[in-house]
Amino acid sequence: MKKTVFLSLLLVVLLVFVSCSGGNATSQSSTGSTGASMSVSTLQTIMDRGVLRAGIALNGPPIGGRDDKGQPYGYDVDFAQKFADTLGVKLEITDVDGETRIPALTSGRVDIVFANMTGNLERAKSINFSTPYLRAGIKMMVRNGSSHEVVEDLNSSSIKIAVARGTTGEELALAYAPKAELVYVANFTDQTLLLKQGKVDATFEDSTLIDFTAGQSKGELVARSKLYTSDPICIGLPKGVMEFVRYVDMFVSWMISSGWQKETYMKWWGTEPTAELVALW
């Protein structure tokens, strides 16, 4: 019942917004090129199809991973499933990583991306972002016994850092440890493996991943305490679909104000969120 009421409310607000845009919306919709017509079509297409195609990074628990049977799980999986449930459709997951998550969206392979992605101005040139549904900061992880405390300690040609392309961690390493050798891998799972094997000296990722992984390593890995960023983790959406973006913003806001986001965070991390999120609606 709550899902039906919520969905109905969102659709009403969406239609009111479109109708209030006046003559421009009417004249432009006849060309089939407006953001309003595209966004309504996007939402309706998903509902008519009966399937939400979501790109999710399944390489870094507890944000996203696979269990022993290969089934997806994690915070992003729960969020995507909740959104699909709200629309009354099934969830279809495409596994993406730092390099493929934006192309998957811009190519139309997926409708939406839940992939632990920081919203920033550079990425916003290619895609749209929702209001943040999580906040995190970049941290450094090293092996137990390492003398490296901060990123500047890694600025040496003898140092190797594991990073994934297109990530904030890569940007940080390039900016503050330019002399170090960057070892590029596909995902955070591979970053962790190389670090455990002693093939690299450090790696960088969101605190949500670093803290969880170090805590599960039985003392083998250590998360350094310094936070290098305070990043808005946002849902990725296609360009030109602003009413779809507005709909997703309302969904995220509802999840925050209802307490569902906090409960889901505590489910996966065992603690309350370290940063407060703001509901826009």
Region roles according to the model:
Residues 15-19:
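C-terminal motif of bacterial Sec signal peptides marking the signal peptidase cleavage site
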Residues 32-116:
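Extracytoplasmic small-molecule ligand-binding "clamshell" domains
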Residues 100-103, 117-125, 172-175, 196-230:
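A ligand-binding cleft/hinge motif common to bilobed small-molecule-binding domains
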Residues 135-142, 207, 211-252, 271-281:
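Periplasmic-binding protein-like
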